[in-house]
Amino acid sequence: MHKLKLHGFNNLTKSLSFCIYDICYAKTADDRAGYIAYIDEQYNANRLTEILSETCSIIGANILNIARQDYEPQGASVTILVSEEPVDPNDVDTSEHPGPLSKTVVAHLDKSHICVHTYPESHPEGGLCTFRADIEVSTCGVISPLKALNYLIHQLESDIVTMDYRVRGFTRDVNGVKHYIDHEINSIQNFMSDDMKALYHMMDVNVYQENIFHTKMLLKDFDLKHYLFNAKPDALSAAERKEITDLLWKEMQEIYYGRNIPHL
């Protein structure tokens, strides 16, 4: 696509949403509680802030503000407000006066922000544990959230990933013609490295005329030792290994396809 000469600022909003899952098997209630505590500490608000700050660096965004919170009993959230251009400290108003209305803040966040929310959980009896991280990178202007794809998937040890990319709004060129997208894309997969694509089974559902792109990813290689918490495969019988493997694989298939699979 040839470069466009725009009339004013690029008003297109580009949003990339991730749903990333890490799956684990923890046999006892104590093990499940231990996994939840471990993953909650591993991906606390401070760690997530580091990941998102690096994401800002990768996509070329400037950080305006960071809000973070760890929750009880578990989970964390981080939201970073970003801009396309560097901010001059001399232009920042630090005087005492009422801030903007919440309506104004939300409108700004909807333009350029990066946020993450985490959701550790476990099955009450079956030994299955999942960690889900929801991430949204939403930018306006020439900044592209697609640059952060490989980094975010790698950082969050992803077994399963669902991604949505959409472009909204329009921008005008100097002749007044509206443009509803400013780059070529037919799949989110085109913005992934070959090494990353080799690791996953992938499936696309795209609505090209609406500038909506959806990709699902499921890790290809399954090694039981990577999915056990406080246990090793050698300590289990062959029957136990098969039972746990079947349980984990069924869980991963259900999450990947977004529907429950009946027991046969």
Curated annotation (Swiss-Prot):
It comes from the Bacteria. Binds 1 pyruvoyl group covalently per subunit. This is S-adenosylmethionine decarboxylase proenzyme. The keyword Lyase applies. Catalyzes the decarboxylation of S-adenosylmethionine to S-adenosylmethioninamine (dcAdoMet), the propylamine donor required for the synthesis of the polyamines spermine and spermidine from the diamine putrescine. Heterooctamer of four alpha and four beta chains arranged as a tetramer of alpha/beta heterodimers. Its cofactor is pyruvate. The active site is at 112 (schiff-base intermediate with substrate), 117 (proton acceptor), 140 (proton donor). It is an enzyme of class 4 (lyase). The modification Pyruvic acid (Ser) is found at residue 112. The gene is speD. Is synthesized initially as an inactive proenzyme. Formation of the active enzyme involves a self-maturation process in which the active site pyruvoyl group is generated from an internal serine residue via an autocatalytic post-translational modification. Two non-identical subunits are generated from the proenzyme in this reaction, and the pyruvate is formed at the N-terminus of the alpha chain, which is derived from the carboxyl end of the proenzyme. SUPFAM superfamilies: S-adenosylmethionine decarboxylase (SSF56276). One of its GO terms (cellular component) is cytosol. InterPro entries: AdoMetDC_fam_prok, S-AdoMet_deCO2ase_bac, S-AdoMet_deCO2ase_core. Pathway: Amine and polyamine biosynthesis; S-adenosylmethioninamine biosynthesis; S-adenosylmethioninamine from S-adenosyl-L-methionine: step 1/1. Its EC number is 4.1.1.50. The keyword S-adenosyl-L-methionine applies. GO terms for molecular function: adenosylmethionine decarboxylase activity. It holds the Pfam family AdoMet_dc. It comes from Serratia proteamaculans (strain 568). One of its GO terms (biological process) is spermidine biosynthetic process. The record marks 111-112 as: Cleavage (non-hydrolytic). It catalyses: S-adenosyl-L-methionine + H(+) = S-adenosyl 3-(methylsulfanyl)propylamine + CO2. Keywords: Autocatalytic cleavage, Decarboxylase, Lyase, Polyamine biosynthesis, Pyruvate, S-adenosyl-L-methionine, Schiff base, Spermidine biosynthesis, Zymogen. Belongs to the prokaryotic AdoMetDC family. Type 2 subfamily.
